[in-house]
């Protein structure tokens, strides 16, 4: 199998080098998690590639380009075409199956894979949301730009075995540039993924430009109130990361907040007192079989929808509860309170680890280790208690070099200067 894969890679490289590059052709690959999160060219605000693409589409100069976009739901192509036509009927945009850079990880027809590959061969620039791709077959006239999807929090360097070193070498040869939110972030990600530090550009994440409240917020709020069954006026979003070490054994089912034995009705009463809702956005890779399913009023599980995504919720949220997810660093830009739910921190530190130690120094908010502390922190947040504003500002300046909403523009000024 390894020999066949090697032969295939050589053939791919030869073919790519034989196909001339069109300087006006661009290739976009959204994050693979868009498949489960239902993010796409219409519901785009939570993915860096999709935000950049929409920024381009809404410029008059979009007609200058030939645009190729990988998609994860082919049944929505007609909706995508209608969406593009509504923006500008003269835009040339082709939708492709998601496969380039991951030929051995996608179940697509050979015909679709071949067509997507030849479209890639023509592209002068390719924008991805993650570095888990092999573009070592690219030619020098092509630029591969990783727009990024995280700011370091968890330890990603030690999460793989020795074969991960080979992956880092491949990654270094695959990408020409990688976008980060700060110099500190760039240095750590460089170590994690193998892309050399000199290839990083600190420009900020496009999705963070949209953390300001948007016109559709009232529509989303009405949907939340309808689902909750009462008029919700305050919102807390819970964004836990996944635990790859969790398995189901008899009696170990935990609540969705992490605790095995806790009275969620107690939290429910507090939420209802303040007309608040706790909206749980689970990680796409979370093992849901370890979670108890019954939830009282006021505690809602975000169900993936093509209408809106996580960053739409964050844009009007009154606060966040999180654990070890890097979404926290993005949320710092709106300067709202954060609660850190560290119910399993010692196990997580042992199994996965962190990018920084002591991690608590970077946590600008209440840190809780048990359910009663979580209850108190939520009550304080809803009552308007906020003693961590200055700490948030310091950490945000450390992890977000730019505190504005111009990241997408900065990226376009460098890589798409025809706009």
PLM feature segments, named:
Residues 2-16, 151-157, 167-252, 383, ...:
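A nucleotide-sugar donor-handling region in carbohydrate enzymes
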Residues 6-43, 241:
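Nucleotide-activated donor-dependent transferases that construct or modify glycoconjugates
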Residues 292-297, 326-399:
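Catalytic binding pocket for nucleotide-activated donors in carbohydrate/polymer assembly enzymes
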Residues 43-53, 207-293, 368:
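Conserved catalytic-core segment of nucleotide-activated headgroup transferases in glycan assembly
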Residues 1-5, 9, 13, 216, ...:
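C-terminal amphipathic helix plus adjacent low-complexity
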Residues 124-148, 307-352:
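A donor-sugar binding/catalytic signature common to diverse glycosyltransferases
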Residues 95-98, 109-123, 279, 284-329:
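Donor nucleotide-activated moiety binding/catalytic core segment of transferases
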Residues 26-212:
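Active-site and donor-binding regions of nucleotide-sugar-utilizing enzymes
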